[in-house]
């Protein structure tokens, strides 16, 4: 029972960190990254569809994204979806491809992004702590129902705390790396 709880805890914490990584990848850091476009939906024959399912997205230069739609008739729809998004980038359309030039970030925008980063990292830490709490409650109920001994409960809680500390440390290192990337001029 304890091993099941521990493996479930670790799995849920890993998913939280993976979610944080994806979330932070979509933040604009002054460099072109196809993940920036993941959340943008394009109206494709009445269906909201992610850009990466409608086009090839390449990064030919550090601050340039090129979107090559497989169906040339949807270029205008893709362009409109990008303009509506909160990316703050104006697409240029030459009829075949859409180019997104990623502008340099201003100092003010960098500081805003760092605030957003810290908020999302804190949300991830809270999620990890909630997972710890849920797992500890499972151990306590197992002890109450005499399914596990008091010693096993204590050892299980210690192991869960170690996992929690390890994952929170990982969240902090992800945050520091992304902060450094954003504050780089």
UniProtKB/Swiss-Prot annotation:
Protein name as it appears in the record: Ribosome-recycling factor
Function noted in UniProt: Responsible for the release of ribosomes from messenger RNA at the termination of protein biosynthesis. May increase the efficiency of translation by recycling ribosomes from one round of translation to another.
Keyword line: Cytoplasm, Protein biosynthesis
A cellular-component GO term for this protein: cytoplasm
One of the GO BP terms on file: translational termination
Entry-linked SUPFAM superfamilies: Ribosome recycling factor, RRF
Annotated source species: Syntrophomonas wolfei subsp. wolfei (strain DSM 2245B / Goettingen)
Primary site of residence: cytoplasm
Pfam families documented for this protein: RRF (PF01765)
Coiled-coil spans in chain: none
UniProt-annotated stretches for the region Disordered: 143-163
Entries under InterPro entries matching the protein: Ribosome_recyc_fac, Ribosome_recyc_fac_dom, RRF_sf
Subcellular location: Cytoplasm
Taxonomic lineage from the root: Bacteria, Bacillati, Bacillota, Clostridia, Eubacteriales
Superkingdom of this protein's organism: Bacteria
Gene3D superfamilies linked to this entry: 3.30.1360.40, Ribosome-recycling factor (1.10.132.20)
Record-stated family: Belongs to the RRF family.
GO molecular function term, any single one: ribosomal large subunit binding
């Amino acid at each position: 029972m304890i091993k099941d709880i521990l493996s479930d805890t670790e799995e849920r914490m890993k998913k939280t960190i993976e979610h944080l990584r994806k979330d932070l990848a979509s933040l604009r850091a002054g460099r072109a990254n196809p993940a920036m476009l993941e959340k943008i939906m394009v109206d494709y024959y009445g269906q909201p569809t992610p850009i990466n399912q409608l086009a090839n997205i390449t990064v030919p230069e550090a601050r340039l994204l090129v979107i090559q739609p497989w169906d040339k008739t949807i270029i205008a729809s893709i362009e409109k979806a990008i303009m509506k998004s909160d990316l703050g980038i104006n697409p240029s359309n030459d009829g075949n491809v859409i180019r997104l030039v990623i502008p340099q970030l201003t100092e003010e925008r960098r500081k805003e992004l760092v605030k957003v980063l810290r908020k999302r990292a804190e949300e991830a830490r809270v999620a990890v702590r909630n997972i710890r709490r849920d797992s500890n409650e499972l151990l306590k109920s197992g002890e109450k129902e005499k399914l596990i001994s008091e010693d096993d409960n204590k050892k299980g809680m210690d192991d869960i705390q170690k996992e929690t500390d390890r994952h929170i440390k990982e969240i902090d290192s992800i945050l520091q790396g992304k902060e450094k990337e954003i504050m780089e001029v």
